[in-house]
Amino acid sequence: MLIILKENITTLGKLGEVVKVKPGYARNFLFPQKKAMKATKENLIKLEEQRLLLEEENTKKLNAAKVLASSLHDKFIILIKQASEDGKIFGSVTTREIAKTLLQEGYDISHHSLSLGGISIKNLGEYQVNIELHSKVIVPITIYVVRSEKDAHELRQAKLQNQKSEQQEAEQDASKEAADADDS
């Protein structure tokens, strides 16, 4: 099926390009997400008329993605899963589960935007997940899979302590630089 892209999509092409995709992908993902439209003569003419508006809309989406990316910077998620003694969890962690957790924390991100990097999360531990907020904005977040609420609480406390010490170090470095600048 031939479609016209209404925004830049890294795996397909740029805004306004006519590309061929499988009909199910177009019907079930691209059209409902308003990322593409059918490639008809009428739509091609309409696209040329709307090109500036679409580029402006794309710029707004990019700016919104950058703002969201800054709030997600250094973000981590803790998931509690039942696991065997050797650390294998029962089932696996999915992008839908991660998206649901992000939603509970106030971030409305589609599971389609999450990338596990081709791995399956089936063990306790730390994992890196990429969130594609825009074709030009990809944010990494850290996922911790732990066995119990107690482990999650300990991890949160350790992370908060680590962030406080990093912040104090940064403040000390800034005050030293200011003092050095005053001495010059």
Curated annotation (Swiss-Prot):
Keywords: Ribonucleoprotein, Ribosomal protein, RNA-binding, rRNA-binding. GO terms for molecular function: rRNA binding; structural constituent of ribosome. Residues 156-184 are annotated as: Disordered. InterPro entries: Ribosomal_bL9, Ribosomal_bL9/RNase_H1_N, Ribosomal_bL9_bac/chp, Ribosomal_bL9_C, Ribosomal_bL9_C_sf, Ribosomal_bL9_N, Ribosomal_bL9_N_sf. Residues 173-184 have a biased composition (Basic and acidic residues). One of its GO terms (biological process) is translation. Gene3D superfamilies: Ribosomal protein L9, C-terminal domain, Ribosomal protein L9, N-terminal domain. One of its GO terms (cellular component) is ribosome. HAMAP family: Ribosomal_bL9. Binds to the 23S rRNA. Belongs to the bacterial ribosomal protein bL9 family. This is Large ribosomal subunit protein bL9. The lineage of its organism: Bacteria, Pseudomonadati, Pseudomonadota, Alphaproteobacteria, Rickettsiales.
